[in-house]
């Protein structure tokens, strides 16, 4: 009940992402500058949970999007970014992100080992 009440207020989901072993040589994380994608680039995807149905977004490519990646991230570095904000009046409510096959990665690069943690931030007003 408390969680459902909290979700009625404004909330944001903040993500922390980092390597857990060796520097990332293969499939690095890339994020899209939230100012560079258009609302029509978003594709709604339904997520089914045991007691509710939610939704997430996927992003269709558009030439105006600007993507940034972080090669060779070490376990001493972390990215912190907002992946969602429930306030629909804000620009930059989402930070689209994914990994990608970096063509400059060595052919024998080890698989990426990383961890992501998502936290919820709840606002009073």
Where are the predicted features?
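A contiguous catalytic/ligand-binding core that recognizes phosphate-bearing ligands
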Residues: 1-39
């Amino acid at each position: 009940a408390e969680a459902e009440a909290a979700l009625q207020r404004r909330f944001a989901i903040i993500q922390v992402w980092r390597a857990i072993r060796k520097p990332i040589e293969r499939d690095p994380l890339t994020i899209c500058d939230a100012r560079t994608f258009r609302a029509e680039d978003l594709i709604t995807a339904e997520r089914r949970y045991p007691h509710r149905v939610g939704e997430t977004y996927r992003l269709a490519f558009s030439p105006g999007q600007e993507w940034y990646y972080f090669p060779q991230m070490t376990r001493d570095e972390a990215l912190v970014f907002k992946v969602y904000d429930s306030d629909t009046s804000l620009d930059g409510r989402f930070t689209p992100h994914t990994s990608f096959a970096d063509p400059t990665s060595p052919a024998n690069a080890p698989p990426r080992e990383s961890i992501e943690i998502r936290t919820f931030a709840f606002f009073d007003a």
